[in-house]
């Protein structure tokens, strides 16, 4: 399926960082090279396992409020502390919506802050 940087996509199959299989999850496309995508996971607030207040305060979780542009059904967070890479365009079921260039910049800034914090440890 065709998609662009900044699109919110529903992915059919992917691998979690621990190697286990994942399916039917939403992501934001942050980079495209050839037929492979780099993605940041999007989490609906109601799906977060621990307290929403704790998750909202994590510096690498950037809130994404639902609106007509991104076409989300619920307010969400983009988890900017991990990039899923090598996802094939064939694994995209649908494009849900899109984020603004400013929001995409915020996601990259949060990821860079995460990497900087890792370097300090």
What are these regions (language model features)?
Residues 10, 29-31, 82:
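A residue-level detector for short acidic-glycine micro-motifs
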Residues 66-121:
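C-terminal terminal-subdomain/extension
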Residues 1-2, 111:
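Extreme N-terminus of proteins, especially the signal/transit-peptide cleavage junction
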Residues 18-68:
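Compact nucleic-acid interaction/catalytic patches
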């Amino acid at each position: 399926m065709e998609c662009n940087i900044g699109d919110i996509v529903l992915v059919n199959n992917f691998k979690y960082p621990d190697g286990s299989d994942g399916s039917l999850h939403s992501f934001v496309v942050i980079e495209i090279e050839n037929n492979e995508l780099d993605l940041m996971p999007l989490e609906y607030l109601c799906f977060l396992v621990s307290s929403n207040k704790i998750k909202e305060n994590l510096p690498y979780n950037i809130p994404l409020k639902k609106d007509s542009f991104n076409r989300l059904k619920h307010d969400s967070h983009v988890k900017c502390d991990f990039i899923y890479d090598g996802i094939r365009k064939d694994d995209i079921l649908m494009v849900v919506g899109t984020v603004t260039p400013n929001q995409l910049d915020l996601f990259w800034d949060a990821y860079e802050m995460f990497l900087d914090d890792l370097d300090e440890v």
